Amino acid sequence: MKLLYLFLAILLAIEEPVISGKRHILRRMGNSGICRASCKKNEQPYLYCRNYQSCCLQSYMRISISGKEENTDWSYEKQWPRLP
């Protein structure tokens, strides 16, 4: 019986959390991307999810393609929010 509980605990720890509907949070985008067949009005498609749906991000999200922060002349208040 203890072996069964151990197996269930390991199985639950390995599985990704279940989210209702067909939305899956895309972890590599800082938990900000949602996989959808089509994005809402205030969202922009960015890359694709594993299930070939668009990864939708809020329109105010700024993504750096180069992987390094760009040096701009913007003041701190005018910068876009950073993804963790």
Swiss-Prot record:
Q: Which residues form the signal peptide?
A: 1-21
Please give a single GO biological process term from the UniProt record: defense response to Gram-negative bacterium
Any idea which UniProt keywords this protein has? Answer: Antibiotic, Antimicrobial, Defensin, Disulfide bond, Secreted, Signal
Major localization class:
secreted
Q: Which residues form a coiled coil?
A: none
List all disulphide bridges recorded for this chain: C35-C49, C39-C56
What family does the database annotate? Belongs to the beta-defensin family.
UniProt name for this protein: Beta-defensin 119
Lineage, broadest ranks: Eukaryota, Metazoa, Chordata, Craniata, Vertebrata
Q: Which gene encodes it?
A: DEFB119
